[in-house]
Amino acid sequence: MKRTSGCSRPIRRPATLAVGFAALAVLAACSSGGSSSPGGGATANSATANGGGAVPGQTVPTANLPVLQKVGKGEGQLNLIAWEGYLDPKWVKPFEQQTGCQVNAKYAGSSDEMVSLMKNGGGGQYDMVSSSGDADLRILYAGDAHPVNIKLIPSWKDFFPAFQSPAFNTINGVHYGVSLQWGPNVLMYNTKDFKTAPSSWDVIYDSKYKGQVTVPDNPIQIADAAVYLKKHKPSLGITDPYELTQPQFQAAVSLLASQKPLIEKYWSLASQEIFDFKNGNAILGAGWPYQVSTLKAANFPIGTTIPAEGATGWADTWMLAAKAPHPNCSYLWMQYISTPKVQAQQAVTYGETPDNKLACAEMDKLQAGSCAEYHANAPQSYFDAISLWKTPLATCDDGKNNCVPYAQWVSAWNTQVK
């Protein structure tokens, strides 16, 4: 597998986000999606409602493109835009051997970078992207994704219903990819410095830890501040951390601006946060289960928790580029990555939750107790605590046009927070 790192690229690109913003500014409320269980009886309301969906008065430009009717021989190459850790040799190498499709990885440090790389349908260079809910609508309504024939993905029928045709990758019955995994953005801490898990996100705003905190270099971090303020400043009236009025938005931005002196690094790649913990530069951080799993594998004293305020999270999709140069290899990848064994491998390695309900047993074969550890059979209360990423739009869920759109999130992050 060949890979291209995004380590040297700054993630400050408001100019690249212009594609689709004219439409996104007037997008209406997201659809509610399904209510079927992803785990032990949970409904995953946020997994469906918070992802996006069909928007009145708007159409996906590529909706009528013909889909593949039969998967042919692979073209020999597959160019993937992915989150770091999503293309581990443990499952990529067997895929390459089975299909003859060599995987070429381009790691992105943020959803904004993924949107930029997918511009013009992937530019005839990229085949697929492992997009999250805060990128999906931008990619779809910019016309950069291609419809997918889900009938060609045999394991799709074994997905939890909430992730078969979710609002974040399926518009008016048309699929633009296949659901992958989902999980929370967690509070990480060095267990030598914290003998018990912090019960609140307070710690990452506490001046006591000046210069010892890491957080993602991502405008969607404003939603994390909103989750915190929803609990600690109820007078703001925040109900959805991605649907903020101007006063709510400014309160979240001000909180993050006051946090700046505490920050050791705004990380753009998971490996940067791992490095800072390993080298003692950070003792607290907002991160992904992947960082936690990697640090634990290195016997580093890392702990993780979802504090009382709750957390944000993601639900990812392997989305097909509108101008994918290797469609057969792309479908072969979707078939492969959706199987219980491979979903289990990624879940255990990355520390996230699979969408294939048969993966739970495979997870426990790989690592005893991992199905429960990574919440594949968690109770409803666990899912209720997580607000999954979605694209902030000007039109709020109640139909009022007084929410702050994502373009302003990007501007505030780059000019007021950092």
State the predicted function of each range.
Residues 49-139:
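Early extracytoplasmic/lumenal segment of secretory-pathway proteins
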Residues 81-82, 86-88, 113, 125, ...:
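Extracytoplasmic ligand-binding site segments that recognize negatively charged/polar headgroups
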Residues 186-193, 228-229, 314-326, 345-349:
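A bilobed periplasmic-binding-protein/Venus flytrap-type ligand-binding module shared by bacterial periplasmic
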